[in-house]
Amino acid sequence: MENKFFLRLSFLAFAFLPFVLTAQSRKDRHLSSAEVLGVRADASVASAAPVQKLDTASIRRMGVTSTADALRRFAGVNLRDYGGAGGLKTVSVRGLGAQHTAVVYDGVTVSNAQQGQIDLGRFSLDRLAGVELHTADEGNLLVPVRQLGAATVVLRSWQPNAQNRGMHGAVALRHGSFGVWNPSVLLSQNWNGRTAVNVSADYYHGNNAYPFTVKNGVATHREKRLNSQMNDWTLEANAHHLLRRGQLSGKVFYVTNHRYLPGPVTLYVSGNNEHLTEQNAFVQLRWEQQYGRWNFFGAGKADWRESKYLDIAGRYPGGRLDQRYKQGEIYASAGASYVWQTLTAAVATDWFRNDLTSNLKVDNDVWRTSWLTSMTLRYAPRHFELTGRLVSSIFRNHATAGTEAAKNASQLSPSLSASWKLMSDQRAHLFVRAHYKEFFRVPTFTENYYYHLGNTHLKPERTQQLGAGVTFAGMLSARWQVQLTADGYVNRVWDKISSIPYNLFVWRTVNLGKVRAAGLDVALHSTWTLRNGQQLIGNGTYTYQRVTDRTDKTSEDYGKQLAYTPLHSGAVSMAWENPWVNAVVSMTAASKRWATNEHTVTTSVPAYADVNLGLYRTFRFRSFQLEARADLTNLFNHQYEVIRRYPMPGRAYRFSALLRW
């Protein structure tokens, strides 16, 4: 199976080779006088910490079909996907775990104090103008402290343009296999050239009853994925006001989601009767202002979240398990920076309060107050940049009478990053970088308080990150532009929070374990400009991750790869843009994984390669623009699993039309 996986990977790579050779073999390199030779190094190229970005053009050219799929194209990302639209989708970066990945939506962090991880399937790709991944340290100095995670996913929605006068809008309709329908609408209005508002609505429905094959020895049987239906409504409003040397933005967001949770497939039993209904609403404001050498920002957010979990099964008293949770958060952040020649100093502070209530008799109300402060200093002469940051974190836990509150926590977390510009001219840029960072996370409410599982005596999970890398961006010829990034790293985790069996029926969450992650991330972007308005855009990422248990040398699991962490993974895409119909072929792949830390035949999860094909074109008439697209996913109808016993969909189609004015 491993050999077949790498044969497919090699075949697709060689399939792209003729396009590359065609672009390089053209001897006529003459350019018109209007063309300018050169490449500009943007902030991500010169950053002292790795930054990966996708804008709407890149998303279109790479055949990306969802927000989770976009993140899967980044190097160093390990996506956990339980299959179908209703399956949970979270990301772990460089082996540190999903709880160490912060998610930022339009400048303010998205939180879930109960679970500690964000389901990225809830963010529709249609509402996003860009997706970024910041690994290790944040390149921007003046940011809320809360987004300074071990890794940060930055999501940017379409913002109203205060300088684009009049009424503008967009309507879209998407339809796909397995009963997927996804209409959406966005309206934007500018009143006076300084103030603009947009309102959007999005509905998603999917039956997700896709077929799959069950194997039992030599016998096979075809089944359909059951209990995977999802309905999702999202409403969002954004306001943007231009100030003199500043801006003020606000967001109101509401989503309600009802999904059936598909259970694991065990031989011929795939039925499940679990339901999850979630509601989330928040209001956030962000202010930015510049006064001479000073820059200021302020942000605030009020967040409410409710989830209702229902499992109908005979093993429960009364035949059902009904759990209801409510979360609330109040959040405030402010900061300032001062620039003096080659020195920049910044300070920011965050305060937030999270609370959780439930209908469980064994639980009482619990809440946590947090105060984070960061102090940053950057020295940036012409060809060198050195940034040091110190983060102070204080967490105080509280509970109503009768419930023991979790342990309080406080810590200082330093980080240091540097970037050197070895070469920079009109045609090429070469940067090298290095970083060191310490970070920790406090236990989630579930890890602290959940019945039979929680432990109020848990210590924070601590991490240490060390890495170095190089980025080259340049014009290799008059028509060939390349950007290549390579980063190596070693990460360590102490006091890792894990759940272990306490007896035959009860599990317990404890600080048990040390983890070491050593890896290599490589990313390549290349553009070949051809004749007659044609170009080839190639993208590729490769990740090597050796993430092992380093807890007990006498244990059988010592030195073994952690569960659901492939040793090799990657993605590749090639788009051909032309005056007729644009085409893109893409592939994501991962080597063999293990469902647990015990490496046996029964816990092995085979390697996979998922190939997609897309066609798209934009039509323009008067002030209207129509984008039409057709995608075929899992082209070879390969059945695979990202999570064991949760089969992914086979071959599927997807049609979409987007009208803008």
Q: What function would you assign to each model-found segment?
A:
Residues 23-60, 68, 98:
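Short, acidic, small-residue-rich periplasmic hinge/interaction motif at the N-terminus
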Residues 208-212, 221-232, 245-296, 300-329, ...:
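Flexible loop and strand-edge segments within Gram-negative outer membrane beta-barrel domains
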Residues 297-311, 432-437, 461-518, 523-527, ...:
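Membrane-embedded beta-barrel scaffold of Gram-negative outer-membrane proteins
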Residues 394-399, 406, 420-467, 488-510, ...:
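Surface-exposed extracellular loop regions of Gram-negative outer-membrane beta-barrel proteins
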Residues 538, 589-596, 604, 615-661:
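C-terminal beta-signal and adjacent terminal beta-strands/loops
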